[in-house]
Amino acid sequence: MVAGVVPSAGELAVFCRPVVTAPAVVGRGGGVRAGGWLPDFVRLGELERHLGDGVIEEVVAAAVEQGRLRGRQRRRLMSYPLLVRLTIAMTLMPDASYCEALVRLVGLLADVPFAREWHVPTEKVITDWRRLVPAGLLESLFWRAAGPLVEDGPGAVRLAGMSVCAADGMLVNLADTPANRAAFGTAGTSDGSGPFPQLRLVGLAARAGRAMLGAILGGTRAGEQTLLKRLVARRPDLVAGRVVCFDRNFPGHDLIAAIVDAGGHVVARVKAGIALPMEPDGWLPDGSRMTWLNAPSGRAADRLPVRAAEHNVVLPHGDGVQVSDTCTLITTLLDHRVAPADAVRATYLTRWSTSETTFGEDKTTITGAGDRTSGPVLRSGSPRLVIAEAWAWLTATQLLRASAAAALNSQTAAARALRRTNNTPVVADEESFTAVWRHAIHAMTTSQVTASSSLDAHAAAAEAAARAALHTLNTPGRERHSPRVQKARPKFRHTIATKTTITGTPRVTVFAPGTS
């Protein structure tokens, strides 16, 4: 077959996929090689399309200019941009070693004859390069990727006209080294005898698209409430104009006051032992009541006014027995006409599918981690490398959700037909995080789409990502059928303590004024 000539029917044709676009270098013997150096062409595939081509190079260049990173002129087996991409990629490949992750990242580029030869370096070389890169560089990259991914549509969850986000925290098991134990500690033990040292992560996740708005890292000695206060103090813009939901481990006068001062509002559950005094004539028509949170100073002038709503939650058990519990929510939205008790309750219920699902996908889906004894999530053996790896992990999962959000925005009639329903658009809660993650790994090893790639290559990559994200769909609003495992450390190390299994949808009743 002659190049440029359309083959006739039945004639054998060779179909080729472009791997890289590079200037040709012709040797004396007539051999053709690709000009350039292989590490300069490595990309993160589908993930880098959403981060932006050249962003990693910009962050590296800024670190060199600021003196945080030493510039390197001579070509070596590694480069700073390649190392950053490898750190991000290896967080999505928990089963791969450094070298195996690099081989997957390089992908088809390894088959391209480059003018300058390159081979996979040893793990020691990769580790030495990791020690050169400050954790702040990966943190800067995370903040470039963080932020809302999906605009709130007409059917989005909003309260008092504001978008909703959720704050939550999780503990991440680390490699068991003396340095990690000394730096991070182990939660739930006073003597540090837990099976693994742990990193505490607190983040803000948007309800729309479950995007990570911001995050902060710390050891186990700092509680979730302390870390969230630090995050709000550093970045008050994250909560401004938003309703922040969190569970009963977070509420406190200073934290809630800080969120309100930043321009946000709070919907939170409080523990049963928290005293919420009744204001005179405090009952409101929607069943909520006016109360306040006492300040640490104890002065009445420093009290924080809030509105409380008690709800009776009936949990149907699998054997037909109903378990009843009382749940008290508080909110800083004091006008019951703007935020009635039913709307406050409905908003709080979205917390599970926002922060709980987001953190569960990040930790459990990718790494297979379950309870606190299931093994390390992050592999680094020194505290500085742990922090860098954690920021890379958060960046990677944010880019996965950016890919899922892009699939939602590009739905065609054919994509909607995949639902086998009434041809309606797919919503974010139906997308499979696992499917998006697996496709990202596949695209990382088979496609190196860069800014110089053709428009057809970009369109093909976007179409493949959307097809993978929309092909396998979850059922939104699924009921829980698994035992709830207690977070408290069991008395004996082989004991698994569980709570009641919930197999039905809770029925919620708002207390009427004057009821007990």
Model-derived segments and spans:
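Extended, structured, electrostatic nucleic-acid-contact surfaces
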Residues: G107-R116
